[in-house]
A protein has these predicted regions:
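Alpha4 helix (beta4-alpha4-beta5 surface) of REC/receiver domains from two-component response regulators
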Residues: 65, 86-102, 113
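The feature encodes the CheY-like receiver
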Residues: 59
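Receiver (REC) domain switch/active-site region of two-component response regulators
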Residues: 107, 116
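Acidic, metal-coordinating helix/loop segments flanking the phosphotransfer/catalytic sites
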Residues: 33-51
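Active-site residues of response regulator receiver
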Residues: 55, 83
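Two-component/phosphorelay signaling modules centered on CheY-like receiver
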Residues: 12-32
Length: 126
């Protein structure tokens, strides 16, 4: 089964780092990229997206707002909010929309638990 992972971050370097970690952990999964929330919506309209990794702090729209919209359209999609801004309020908002929280700087070790859970959810259908 081909799995498409959408990496949303306004930092090209952060997208590259996420891609490296993703490739190390799930080499068969395909990476799609978006540099903004608007670009992410465009990608979602054109491509099948199975998993989303979304930066919290983006210029025109925060990642939690984007994640909430994705959750409405895709109730079982594994979604992770990635941020260096570790505040209880952000973690609580992520949990409200059933999104995981992954701390920056993103590492393979930090992403491993989320991707393992995502793989299980995709195999079991939700």
């Amino acid at each position: 089964m081909s799995v498409n992972v959408l990496v949303v971050d306004d930092s090209k370097l952060a997208r590259i780092n996420a891609g490296k970690a993703l490739c190390a952990l799930q080499p068969d999964w395909q990476r799609l990229e978006a540099g903004s929330a608007a670009e992410a919506v465009d990608v979602m309209e054109r491509e099948q997206v199975d998993v989303a990794l979304i930066d919290f702090n983006m210029a025109e729209r925060d990642g939690l707002s984007l994640a909430a919209d994705l959750r409405e359209r895709h109730p079982t999609m594994p979604i992770a909010i990635i941020t260096a801004n570790i505040q209880d309020e952000i973690i609580a908002r992520a949990r409200e929309i059933n999104a995981s929280f992954v701390a920056k700087p993103l590492t393979a070790e930090g992403l491993q638990g989320f991707l393992a859970g995502a793989a299980l959810r995709l195999r079991t259908g939700g």
